[in-house]
Each structure stands twice: as structure tokens, then as C-alpha cells.
């Protein structure tokens, strides 16, 4: 018994200072973005009372200060999220995006008077448990002294193979599947967003590390690799924005959000494990615990989104495809969809 206790202490050395910084930034990001959904929705409702609703093509919300406060809050959250990747591994930062769902659900219940059902409360609890599990067992951030080191990791055969598969699969979906199945199968648009998104997060992390080192006195801006990562970020984000908006415009958000969260987060973790070798610094118990934490978050996310379909305690099955104009006043979606979604 004493030996097993000692081995556990040896395997768990606590969180590094960088991981703590990344955790604080990620949680701050979730707080800002989760709150921004509520503020923006209040602004949209206020604007709709005096002008044309956004869901039917109106832009009166642009004259509503409350909506702009919400957008500013969301921008602060995205900046904090960007900074979090510079300090902590993607395995820690990315799953914590689910915390913003909890913030949104609770604030919607308090401020917007949107009923939070018992299963929604259970979903929030599962997200908290899963997030805590991942935080306590996340790997330490890799020590990197130059953007060249990140470039070397990105150009290793394993990650190059992964990146080639991702790009090939995304191009194949765009060319062959989008024209035929884009409007009928939700997995087409979400698949493109998730594949490209995993590469965008790796590039965002590389760019964040470069900026962190630059601000600490080691200038990384004169390395061409820094600008290559910047170009990749811009290309990937534009692609994500395009196909995510298509998905949200075509399908019900209650369907898009959980599927996208599962695929995006899973592929991002896989990309991080391959590129930064996060799991090489952990034992089997820690890895399995992290996976269990992630599955717990997924379960909570599913429950939260299912409660959107519950009216007066009865479950209503929504059609797979629904007009964005009908669904404009729907519940609070996941941060990564809404942060890229057009108003």
C-alpha cells in the first residue's frame, strides 16, 4: 500500500507555473466568452424590439451598445484563449472550452430566465468533474526556447504524415462531398472544420510561443517560421469560419455544437499528442484518467444540449435541418462555434 502511494506521488508532481498560467487564462476565456453570449443575446433582443431582427436579415443590433459590449467581451475571451495556448498544452486548454457552456447556461437561467432543467444541471456537474480531472492530470508544458524548436517538431515525419492526411481529407471533402452532401449531411461541414481546426490550434500555439518569447526579450519575429505559422493560422481560421457558418446556417445548432465539440477537441488532442508528444511524459494511469475526464465532459455537453429541446419537461425531437431564421433565438451554443459565427 505504501509503495503504491509513493509511486502515485512520484507520478503526480503538481502543476507547473506555466500550466497554472494557462489554466487561469483558459478559465478566464471561458468566463468572458460564456458571459458574452448572454450580453449579445440581450442586445439582440433589445435591438429587435426597435428594428428588424437579425434572424431575418436586420442589422439594427449594430446600433445597440449592449451588443457591442458583448462582442468586446468575446474578443477579450478569445485573446485570453490564444494566450493560454502559449503556456499550457492543448490537452489542458482545449477541453476547458466546455466551461463556457456552464457559464452561459447558469447566466441564461439567472438573467434571461431560460429554465435550466435537471438534466442541464447534471450536464454542468459532469463538465465540472471532467474539467477538474483533466486539469489535475494534464501533462506539464514542454520547455521551448525558440520557434525553431516548434518548427522542428512540426516537420517531424509523424506530424507531417498527420498534417498530410488532414489536408488531404479536408480537400477531398470540399471537392467531392460538399457539392453532393453538404446540405444534407451534418458531418461534411463539421468534418472540414474539425480537421482544419486541429492544425489551426497547433499553429496558434506555435505563434503564441513565439510571441511569449518575444515579449520576454528573445525576439522571434525575424524567423521566417513565425510568419509561416501566422499564415497557416489565417488560412485555417478563414476556412473554419466559412464551413462552420455553412453548418450553422443549414443545421440545428443543438446538433452541430456537440458533434463539432467532440470532433474538434478529439482531433486537436491527437494533433498535440503527435506534434508535442504530450503523452510521452506521462504514465498509462494519467493518460487513461485524462481520457475518462474528456469522456465525462462529452457526456455533460450532450446532456446540456439535449435540454435545449425540452419544453415543460417533455423532450422534443427537432428536425436535423432547420432554418437559421426560425432558430435565431435558440439556446446558448458552444464557445468555438459561436465565437466564429456571424451575428
UniProtKB/Swiss-Prot annotation:
This is Probable magnesium transporter NIPA4. The keyword Magnesium applies. It is a multi-pass membrane protein. SUPFAM superfamilies: Multidrug resistance efflux transporter EmrE. It is found in: Cell membrane; Early endosome. The chain crosses the membrane at residues 19-39, 67-87, 91-111, 116-136, 158-178, 190-210, 221-241, 255-275, 284-304. Its main location: membrane.
Amino acid at each position: 500500500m505504501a509503495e503504491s502511494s509513493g509511486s502515485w506521488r512520484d507520478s503526480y508532481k503538481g502543476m507547473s507555473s506555466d500550466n497554472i498560467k494557462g489554466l487561469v487564462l483558459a478559465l478566464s476565456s471561458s468566463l468572458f466568452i460564456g458571459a458574452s453570449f448572454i450580453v449579445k443575446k440581450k442586445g439582440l433582443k433589445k435591438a429587435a424590439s426597435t428594428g428588424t431582427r437579425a434572424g431575418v436579415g436586420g442589422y439594427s443590433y449594430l446600433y445597440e451598445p449592449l451588443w457591442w459590449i458583448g462582442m468586446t467581451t468575446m474578443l477579450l475571451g478569445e485573446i485570453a484563449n490564444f494566450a493560454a495556448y502559449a503556456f499550457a498544452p492543448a490537452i489542458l486548454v482545449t477541453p476547458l472550452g466546455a466551461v463556457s457552456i456552464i457559464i452561459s447556461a447558469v447566466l441564461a437561467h439567472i438573467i434571461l430566465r431560460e429554465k435550466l432543467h435537471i438534466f442541464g444541471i447534471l450536464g454542468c456537474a459532469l463538465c465540472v468533474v471532467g474539467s477538474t480531472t483533466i486539469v489535475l492530470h494534464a501533462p506539464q508544458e514542454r520547455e521551448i526556447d525558440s520557434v525553431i524548436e516548434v518548427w522542428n517538431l512540426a516537420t517531424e515525419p509523424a506530424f507531417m504524415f498527420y498534417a498530410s492526411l488532414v489536408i488531404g481529407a479536408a480537400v477531398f471533402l470540399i471537392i467531392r462531398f460538399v457539392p453532393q452532401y453538404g446540405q444534407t449531411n451534418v458531418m461534411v461541414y463539421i468534418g472540414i472544420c474539425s480537421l482544419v481546426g486541429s492544425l489551426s490550434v497547433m499553429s496558434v500555439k506555435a505563434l503564441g510561443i513565439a510571441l511569449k518569447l518575444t515579449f520576454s526579450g528573445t525576439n522571434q519575429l525575424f524567423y521566417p517560421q513565425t510568419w509561416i505559422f501566422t499564415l497557416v493560422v489565417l488560412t485555417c481560421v478563414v476556412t473554419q469560419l466559412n464551413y462552420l457558418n455553412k453548418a450553422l446556417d443549414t443545421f440545428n445548432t443543438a446538433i452541430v455544437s456537440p458533434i463539432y465539440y467532440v470532433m474538434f477537441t478529439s482531433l486537436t488532442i491527437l494533433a498535440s499528442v503527435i506534434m508535442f508528444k504530450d503523452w510521452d511524459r506521462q504514465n498509462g494511469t494519467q493518460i487513461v484518467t485524462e481520457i475518462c475526464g474528456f469522456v465525462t465532459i462529452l457526456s455533460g455537453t450532450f446532456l446540456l444540449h439535449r435540454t435545449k429541446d425540452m419544453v415543460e419537461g417533455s423532450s422534443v425531437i427537432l428536425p436535423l435541418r432547420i432554418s437559421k431564421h426560425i432558430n435565431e433565438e435558440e439556446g446558448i451554443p458552444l464557445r468555438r462555434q459561436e465565437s466564429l459565427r456571424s451575428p
